[in-house]
């Protein structure tokens, strides 16, 4: 399977909304190459500096790179994305540029290695690419070794980072966890590192399940996490203490009742992938079903909600 890389150069003011548009239309990740980063080359959180190459960045503005399955990226989708971008009030229409290229599946892993380095994703969790060596800064630091492959979920997106923070807060070793839309398996691995013994990881994409299994192996938990293809929670008959879902808002909306029914009394529904424009609707739906909202995180236009199943 090949992938279409859609590259868009836009002004800074439109980056957040443009990223949301690309992800809402199914982009498997968005790379942000900001020309300002060349001026303010940051030191990463664990004390090493990665030199940036001028040729990798636009002369001005921001380059967004979005990745779509070549089989589903057609003229209709291309035009929908372009129309929505051009309708943004924040967009400087005189300086927007579009380009595309095909990336073969065999090139995909190496493409992502250019952007993925160890980083602290939350208070406890550090994400470490499988091809790099990293020394822990503290005994309590929990390292997740990851190769995102085709499934992404590297932990650097605000939704994943917020889910990791929620896992730190609400998941206990005695809990059972089901991770819906596991992707790279990062949230299941985090639950394992917390000490959870019963974890089930679902994804409708069999390739994602395969990538997740490989990441479980890298983190020495392949025999401890059940990874299977699954269509949300529609066929789930088991009960769990924690349901985690970091997926698109409209899919979350479809599964709220099933999440409630899957949880044990007092259990938690940790969910993100929700843009700020849609979170009030998701929150209201959760409350109508019976969830008590106990946590609400916001980060760069994204929201993570935690609802608890409680009886009246």
UniProtKB/Swiss-Prot annotation:
KW Methyltransferase (keyword) present: yes
GO function terms (MF aspect): protein-lysine N-methyltransferase activity
Residues the entry annotates as binding S-adenosyl-L-methionine: 160, 181, 203, 246
Source superkingdom: Bacteria
Keywords attached to this entry: Cytoplasm, Methyltransferase, S-adenosyl-L-methionine, Stress response, Transferase
Record field: catalytic activity: L-lysyl-[protein] + 3 S-adenosyl-L-methionine = N(6),N(6),N(6)-trimethyl-L-lysyl-[protein] + 3 S-adenosyl-L-homocysteine + 3 H(+)
GO biological process annotation, one example: methylation
Compartment(s): Cytoplasm
Induction comment: By heat shock.
Enzyme kind, highest EC tier: transferase
EC id: 2.1.1.-
Gene Ontology CC terms: cytoplasm
Pfam families: PrmA
Cytoplasm found in the keyword field: yes
InterPro entries: Ribosomal_L11_MeTrfase_PrmA, Ribosomal_PrmA_MeTrfase, SAM-dependent_MTases_sf
Stated role: Methylates ribosomal protein L11.
PANTHER family: ELECTRON TRANSFER FLAVOPROTEIN BETA SUBUNIT LYSINE METHYLTRANSFERASE
Annotated family: Belongs to the methyltransferase superfamily. PrmA family.
Matches recorded under NCBIfam families: prmA
Alphabetized HAMAP family for the sequence: Methyltr_PrmA
Protein name: Ribosomal protein L11 methyltransferase
Organism name: Staphylococcus aureus
């Amino acid at each position: 399977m090949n992938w279409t890389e859609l590259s868009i150069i836009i002004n800074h003011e439109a980056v957040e909304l443009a990223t949301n548009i690309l992800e809402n239309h199914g982009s498997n990740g968005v790379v942000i190459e900001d020309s300002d980063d060349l001026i303010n080359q940051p030191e990463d959180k664990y004390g090493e500096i990665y030199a940036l190459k001028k040729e990798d960045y636009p002369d001005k503005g921001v380059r967004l790179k979005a990745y779509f399955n070549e089989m589903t990226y057609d003229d209709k989708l291309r035009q929908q994305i372009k129309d929505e971008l051009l309708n943004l009030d924040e967009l400087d229409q005189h300086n927007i540029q579009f380009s595309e290229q095909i990336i073969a599946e065999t090139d995909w892993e190496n493409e992502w290695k250019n952007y993925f380095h160890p980083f602290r994703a939350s208070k406890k969790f550090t994400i470490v690419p499988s091809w790099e060596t990293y020394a822990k800064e503290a005994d309590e630091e929990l390292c997740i070794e990851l190769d995102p492959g085709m499934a992404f979920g590297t932990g650097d997106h605000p939704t994943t980072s917020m889910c990791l923070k929620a896992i730190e807060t609400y998941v206990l070793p005695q809990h059972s966890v089901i991770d819906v839309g596991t992707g790279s398996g990062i949230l299941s691995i985090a639950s394992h590192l917390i000490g959870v013994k019963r974890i089930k990881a679902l994804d409708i994409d069999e390739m994602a399940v395969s990538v997740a299994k490989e990441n479980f192996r890298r983190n020495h938990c392949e025999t401890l996490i059940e990874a299977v293809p699954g269509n949300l929670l529609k066929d789930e008959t088991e009960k769990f203490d924690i349901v985690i879902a970091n997926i698109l808002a409209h899919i979350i909306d479809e599964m709220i009742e099933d999440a409630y029914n899957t949880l044990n009394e007092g259990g938690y529904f940790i969910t993100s992938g929700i843009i700020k424009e849609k979170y009030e609707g998701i929150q209201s739906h959760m409350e109508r079903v019976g969830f008590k909202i106990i946590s609400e995180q916001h980060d760069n236009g994204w929201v993570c909600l935690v609802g608890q199943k409680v009886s009246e």
